[in-house]
Regions:
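Alpha-carbonic anhydrase
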Residues: 2-4, 9-169
Length: 169
């Protein structure tokens, strides 16, 4: 199975759960974890996420925020080997139950592109997938969230899919 990588320039591609453990939504000093209040049902699903926090209000008006539908014939594909993802070991891994999913705190990974290098902040799972590929949801999606100088690229892998997408945030 061949994986392809696509770079999508999105203004606000990282969702509330994806921000956890980054400079925009740091972990608490005492180790407690706030439980997320979003879900994937009709009344709490993606179309209502903008109302969870006043800071999300712009999401009700935009077209480039999570969740998105990745249309494979409308994207620019990265050249082979132009993106490097590395997690050398799983030492000191921590698991956190956020109420809406499992987050894995593993900070020794990197994502390197032709223009930047990013440090892994965390990764977490969505079931079903948060995003769609050609209008299709998948059973599960994993988001690897990276950070460098306030930029938050997200490497997303959907199960049952050969697509690997990187959202440059």
């Amino acid at each position: 199975m061949k994986a392809t990588a696509a770079i999508l320039s999105l203004i606000a591609s990282v969702t509330a759960s994806c921000l956890h453990g980054t400079s925009l939504l740091p972990r608490s000093a005492d180790g407690t974890v706030d439980i997320n209040s979003f879900n994937y049902t009709n009344t709490g699903g993606p179309l209502t996420w903008y109302g969870l926090n006043g800071k999300n209000s712009a999401c009700s008006k935009g077209k480039h925020q999570s969740p998105i539908d990745i249309v494979t014939h409308d994207i620019d594909y990265a050249t082979a080997n132009s993106i490097r993802f590395n997690v050398p070991s799983a030492d000191n891994t921590k698991f956190e139950n956020l109420g809406s999913g499992l987050e894995v705190v593993l900070t020794n990974g990197t994502l390197v592109t032709s223009t930047s290098s990013y440090k892994l902040a965390q990764f977490h799972f969505h079931t079903p997938s948060e995003h769609r590929i050609n209008e299709e949801y998948y059973p599960m999606e994993v988001h690897f969230v990276f950070e460098n100088s306030g930029k938050l690229p997200l490497l997303s892998l959907s199960t049952g899919s050969i697509q690997t997408c990187i959202y440059a945030g």
